[in-house]
Amino acid sequence: MIAPYRSTPVFDENSLPAALRGEHSTKAGVWGVIRVLEGRMRLDYADPPSTRLMEAGEAALCLPQQAHSVAPLGPMRMRVDFYDRDPAGDAPV
């Protein structure tokens, strides 16, 4: 299993930055894994358009340059791990 080269701090429903709540993407060559630690949140992918409701213990992969946004659904805690290669190719996300 590969280790992330960087991780965000743990965010809650109050500390989640506006930049993550709005549409954004990772850079070329950067995969993001969103990890819900507690509670629930919504992950919206822009292209192709889809929505995923996530609960504690779940993780979701964001591909390089894939536009997306997140929104808390009540109290929650989450973080994002960043990888320089596809973590799904090595082990379950």
Region locations from a protein language model:
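Short, conserved beta-strand element in jelly-roll/cupin
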Residues: 28-42
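A short, N-terminal "cap"/entry segment at the start of jelly-roll beta-barrel domains
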Residues: 1-26
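Double-stranded beta-helix
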Residues: 7-15, 80-93
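Ligand-binding loop in jelly-roll beta-barrel domains
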Residues: 64-89
